[in-house]
Amino acid sequence: MKIKELQKKIADALNGCEELVQGSCRAIVEDSMTVALDIQKQLQTVKGVAIVVMTPTFTRNGSCADGLPVETQLTIQCVEVPEHNRLQTGRLTALDAAEIVASSLDSNELNFIRIAQSADAPTRSIIVQVDFNVSIILN
């Protein structure tokens, strides 16, 4: 599996989650050429939660004939600007979205690690990070 394929598979699964869609959330992949614009559009135009699927680290996990086995950290960031997002009822907060992401993706393939929350003062946004471990074979 290629890294982009993994990210797209996860983003597609999240965009297919009715609870996230109804809560004004949209998942995008980090390696998209337009990721910054996509995040900005989601936060400023739709004024919902932007969910960014990333794979920041890889560690070799043995060897095999089919490719390179790796363990990767899958990071999903749920980003919101509360003053925009929370103006309408029925919208999910970044933390709400992160909890749904964690519970909907935790499986034998994706092992949930943690949820961590932070604030970015310059952009007035809240970022909630959901981390998983996943083993794949890069080919």
What spans do the regions from the language model cover?
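Oligomerization/assembly interface segments of phage tail-like spikes and tubes
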Residues: D66-H84, R124-I136
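Short histidine-centered catalytic/ligand-binding loop motif
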Residues: P82-A94
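Acidic-leaning, charged glycine-interspersed low-complexity segments
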Residues: E19-S24, T45-V49, L92-N139
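A short, hydrophobic secondary-structure junction motif
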Residues: T55-P56, E80-H84, E99-N108
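Small/polar-rich, solvent-exposed N-terminal microdomains that initiate assembly or binding
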Residues: M1-A65, L92
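Compositionally biased, intrinsically disordered low-complexity segments enriched
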Residues: S32, I39-Q44, T75, V79-P82, ...
